[in-house]
Curated annotation (Swiss-Prot):
Annotated motif Nuclear export signal, positions: 137-146
Ranges for region Disordered: 205-237
Name of the molecule in the record: Non-structural protein 1
Location of the region described as CPSF4-binding in the Swiss-Prot/TrEMBL record: 180-215
Region entry PABPN1-binding, spans: 223-230
Record keyword Ubl conjugation present: yes
Motif segment (Nuclear localization signal): 34-38
Compartments (UniProt record): Host nucleus; Host cytoplasm
GO terms classed as biological process: symbiont-mediated suppression of host cytoplasmic pattern recognition receptor signaling pathway via inhibition of RIG-I activity; symbiont-mediated suppression of host gene expression; symbiont-mediated suppression of host mRNA processing; symbiont-mediated suppression of host PKR/eIFalpha signaling; symbiont-mediated suppression of host type I interferon-mediated signaling pathway
GO CC annotation terms, alphabetical: host cell cytoplasm; host cell nucleus
Task of the protein: Inhibits post-transcriptional processing of cellular pre-mRNA, by binding and inhibiting two cellular proteins that are required for the 3'-end processing of cellular pre-mRNAs: the 30 kDa cleavage and polyadenylation specificity factor/CPSF4 and the poly(A)-binding protein 2/PABPN1. In turn, unprocessed 3' end pre-mRNAs accumulate in the host nucleus and are no longer exported to the cytoplasm. Cellular protein synthesis is thereby shut off very early after virus infection.
Chain's gene name: NS
């Protein structure tokens, strides 16, 4: 096992512990708490993959951080902070929408890279809106916290979330997963729209009908899917 992988996990465990203390003292806001919960799932997955105990890793991580801080000069710390771009937290969903439990009549789940896609295949002929909470840096989506698909009645019928055991994803991973979710929902004659906020930061533009700009590859894939569906409908007739 690579030593850097282990030390990175140990430091992440300790930093999570520090952030947990901030929340326990009621000093963290909602986005801070969202990231804390997401990172907790990620650390559990990484710990299981690496075969490391989180409590022991936290103790070692504390020692690593204390050593770095002891050697770090105040001036160097100021320069580091000044050169690090700040990310923003974007909230399409309310805390209630983000934390609500939901159930599927005909569940379907697919893993697309480091992201897990879930949808209810029983949903048909509905108007659906995709909304997400995520962080942004340089006006581009940086990290997806959670994406959910809502009907006009407010029911949750789909979801995209990072895999706890597979930390880290790119904006292309997110866009590909959104394409898969849209394709799955549209298969049952649902009309899917993407929130303007998500369009702006994921694609850099917005579409008046609520659909994300599609790449030529995505357009060809959707065209093949449509032709296949038409052939099956004719055979059924």
């Amino acid at each position: 096992m690579d030593s850097n992988t282990v030390s990175s996990f140990q430091v992440d465990c300790f930093l999570w512990h520090v952030r947990k203390q901030v929340v326990d003292q009621e000093l963290g806001d909602a986005p801070f708490l969202d990231r804390l919960r997401r990172d907790q799932r990620s650390l559990r997955g990484r710990g299981s993959t690496l075969g490391l105990d989180i409590k022991a890793a936290t103790h070692v991580g504390k020692q690593i951080v204390e050593k770095i801080l002891k050697e770090e000069s105040d001036e160097a710390l100021k320069m580091t902070m000044a050169s690090t771009p700040a990310s923003r937290y974007i909230t399409d969903m309310t805390i209630e929408e983000l934390s609500r439990n939901w159930f599927m009549l005909m569940p379907k789940q697919k893993v697309e890279g480091p992201l897990c896609i879930r949808m209810d295949q029983a949903i048909m002929e509905k108007n659906i809106m995709l909304k997400a909470n995520f962080s942004v840096i340089f006006d581009r989506l940086e990290t997806l916290v959670l994406l959910r698909a809502f009907t006009e009645e407010g029911a949750i019928v789909g979801e995209i979330s990072p895999l706890p055991s597979f930390p880290g994803h790119t904006i292309e991973d997110v866009k590909n997963a959104i394409g898969v979710l849209i394709g799955g929902l549209e298969w049952n004659d649902n009309t899917v729209r993407v929130s303007k906020t998500l369009q702006r930061f994921a694609w850099g533009s917005s579409n008046e009908n609520g659909g994300p700009p599609l790449t030529p590859k995505q357009k060809r894939k959707m065209a093949r899917t449509a032709r296949s569906k038409v052939r099956r409908d004719k055979m059924a007739d």
